[in-house]
């Protein structure tokens, strides 16, 4: 996230008003794309894939203002030992790989370093604590994909995230 923000600052210093900087899935953007439309990026479906080849889209995030978007997940960087999957996200409380139900956490924030930090933190803290933290952190919105008690993928997002989800019609928003 930090590197994306630094490059964005360099572009702005050169007078560039419309850009999208993506480094390793961390994105800083401002203005519009070459077609005059708001920038759109995809959130991948959390499918186990250590190769990074699978790129099926779960959701689209659209940003029409300056900001950062980052997604952290446990479905690409992991290892399996004795039949158990270990994610690359380390829980700072234990020093061991995080064992939470969150598969993917996407954050929209004013800058990418903030989005990146909270996306990783949400992965480590788990759904309940992430939900509570988001209520107390001004300027961030979240979209989380998690595994429920039956192993089925579910989504949850903050109310403010709806403004960045162009594929969700108003009627669907009111019913969720």
Task: Label each residue range with its predicted role.
Residues 1-176:
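Mature catalytic core of soluble alpha/beta enzymes
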């Amino acid at each position: 996230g930090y590197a994306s923000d630094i490059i964005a600052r360099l572009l702005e210093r050169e007078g560039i008003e419309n850009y999208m900087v993506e480094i390793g899935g961390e994105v800083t953007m401002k203005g519009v794309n070459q077609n005059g439309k708001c920038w759109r990026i995809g959130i991948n479906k959390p499918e186990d894939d250590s190769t990074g080849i699978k790129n099926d889209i779960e959701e689209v995030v659209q940003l029409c203002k300056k900001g950062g978007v980052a997604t952290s997940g446990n479905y690409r960087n992991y290892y399996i030992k004795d039949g158990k999957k270990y994610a690359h996200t380390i829980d700072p409380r234990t020093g061991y790989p995080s064992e939470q139900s969150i598969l993917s956490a996407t954050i929209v924030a004013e800058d990418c370093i903030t989005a990146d930090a909270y996306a990783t933190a949400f992965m480590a803290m788990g759904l309940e604590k992430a939900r509570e933290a988001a209520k107390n952190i001004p300027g961030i919105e979240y979209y989380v994909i998690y595994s429920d008690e039956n192993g089925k993928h579910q989504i949850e997002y903050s109310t403010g995230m709806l403004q960045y989800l162009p594929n969700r019609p108003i009627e669907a928003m009111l019913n969720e």
